[in-house]
């Protein structure tokens, strides 16, 4: 039997105080547990594959700060590098050698990137790349996909995923129609709809931006031929193809989704992993396109803390760790064991589920599946997911508090962690 015995008294007290200080008591909406019920747990510390809350409860973590913690939380080599960097200062507001080092690592790894610009978040990266798409092509319209999330900038809050989907918001108040009027949307994995948009708006579309593997509407991989088709359509129409690899970059392979699937876009956005747990973002691509960016060209973009030495240091050390032999084989093995076990246990308990993984990224829907699109994801049983989430929390497993978020493993997850997670799932899934 499931019992609600988790002691979260201190978390509740802190969250109650936070609600008087911050909108909804959080700094980012999905953290509020709105879609799964109950109140959020407040973290005290993290280490490896585990997190501890302020009440002393320990959890196996499959959120990983929403993706960055691919090597595990508080990796000793990353911490050592950061401590050394701290002695030199936290921010320069000027060029530093560390930018060159991380830039070279990114350029060497990501097939599309010949030149890169560092920023402070994935949202910044996507805002900047949209401006660059328009500046380079001289066109204003952009195609995005339903359920794909590219940050909270006005022009992207159209049929967006992540927190927008989690809270059930149609889009967002405060976004003028004049801003979103040039944002066209298509169902993910639907090439016909993309071709139709190009036919309806000839010579007006600057490009197509997408999560090559969707992680902000749950885990939704591309159908066979989808990415290839987008590459062909954009080339035929003189438009740019942009992969938003803020989530997939350095996670599903060292060179991201574009390396994994063998499709090279014109531009790429990055974040999460390349900051090693510190705030970071980046965008890059073909040299002729990136030459438009100031001060090399006329398209303006800037940032006070961009390229700061701490984020660069953490990113460099994280990528060094990921380059070691067997890294992605380990992620694939551990994640495969996790998701195959969850699916089997759920089905044996009588639940209709579907899901999958690519290396360190995974997802499961309470739906017969397969899930190809945002509409498919929305048809999954959200109420059952909420019960599953709470039950797993009671059993010491921390999952993303939304069915519209992918899960993540790290190099710190062990077979014992996976076994414990699956044992917890047996208890929970037998009782919901």
Swiss-Prot record:
User: What reaction(s) does this enzyme catalyze?
Assistant: (S)-4-amino-5-oxopentanoate = 5-aminolevulinate
Q: Which Pfam families match?
A: Aminotran_3
Query: What EC number(s) would the UniProt record show?
Result: 5.4.3.8
Give the pathway listed in the UniProt entry for this protein.
Porphyrin-containing compound metabolism; protoporphyrin-IX biosynthesis; 5-aminolevulinate from L-glutamyl-tRNA(Glu): step 2/2; Porphyrin-containing compound metabolism; chlorophyll biosynthesis
Record PTM N6-(pyridoxal phosphate)lysine, positions in chain: 272
- Just give the chief location class: cytoplasm
Source organism phylogeny: Bacteria, Bacillati, Cyanobacteriota, Cyanophyceae, Acaryochloridales
Give the protein's recorded name. Glutamate-1-semialdehyde 2,1-aminomutase
Q: Which InterPro entries match?
A: 4pyrrol_synth_GluAld_NH2Trfase, Aminotrans_3, Aminotrans_3_PPA_site, PyrdxlP-dep_Trfase, PyrdxlP-dep_Trfase_major, PyrdxlP-dep_Trfase_small
Q: Which NCBIfam families match?
A: hemL (TIGR00713), PRK00062.1 (NF000818)
Query: How does it associate, per the subunit comment?
Result: Homodimer.
């Amino acid at each position: 039997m499931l019992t609600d015995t988790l002691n979260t008294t201190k978390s509740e007290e802190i969250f109650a105080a936070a609600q008087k200080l911050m909108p909804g008591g959080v700094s980012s909406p999905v953290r509020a547990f709105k879609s799964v019920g109950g109140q959020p747990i407040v973290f005290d510390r993290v280490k490896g594959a585990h997190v501890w809350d302020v009440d002393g409860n320990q959890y196996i973590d499959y959120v990983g700060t929403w993706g960055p913690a691919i090597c595990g939380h508080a990796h000793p080599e990353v911490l050592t590098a950061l401590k050394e960097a701290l002695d030199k200062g936290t921010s320069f507001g000027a060029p530093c050698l560390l930018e060159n080092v991380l830039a070279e690592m990114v350029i060497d790894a990501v097939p599309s990137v010949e030149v890169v610009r560092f920023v402070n978040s994935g949202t910044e990266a996507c805002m900047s790349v949209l401006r660059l798409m328009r500046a380079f092509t001289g066109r204003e319209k952009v195609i995005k996909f339903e359920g794909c999330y590219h940050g909270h900038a006005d022009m992207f809050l159209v049929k967006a995923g992540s927190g927008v989907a989690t809270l059930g918001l149609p889009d967002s108040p405060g976004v003028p129609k004049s801003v979103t009027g040039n944002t066209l949307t298509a169902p993910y994995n639907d090439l016909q709809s993309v071709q139709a948009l190009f036919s309806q708006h000839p010579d007006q579309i600057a490009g197509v931006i997408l999560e090559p593997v969707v992680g902000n509407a749950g885990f939704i991989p591309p159908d066979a031929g989808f990415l290839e088709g987008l590459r062909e359509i954009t080339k035929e129409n003189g438009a740019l193809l942009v992969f938003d690899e803020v989530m997939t970059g350095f996670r599903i392979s060292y060179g991201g989704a574009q390396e994994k699937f063998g499709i090279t876009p014109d531009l790429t956005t990055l974040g999460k992993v390349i900051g090693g747990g510190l705030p970071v973002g980046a965008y890059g691509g073909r040299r002729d396109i990136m030459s438009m960016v100031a001060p090399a060209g006329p398209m303006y973009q800037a940032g006070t803390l961009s390229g700061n030495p701490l984020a660069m240091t953490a990113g460099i050390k994280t990528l060094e760790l990921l380059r070691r032999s067997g890294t992605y084989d380990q992620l694939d093995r551990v994640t495969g064991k996790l998701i195959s076990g969850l699916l089997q246990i759920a089905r044996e308990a009588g639940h209709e589920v579907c899901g999958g993984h690519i290396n360190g990224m995974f997802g499961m829907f309470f739906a017969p599946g397969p899930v190809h699109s945002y509409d498919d994801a929305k048809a999954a049983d959200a109420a059952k997911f909420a019960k599953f989430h709470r039950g797993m929390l009671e059993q010491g497993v921390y999952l993303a508090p939304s069915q519209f978020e992918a899960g993540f493993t790290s190099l710190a997850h062990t077979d014992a962690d996976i076994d414990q997670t699956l044992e917890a799932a047996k208890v929970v899934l037998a009782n919901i």
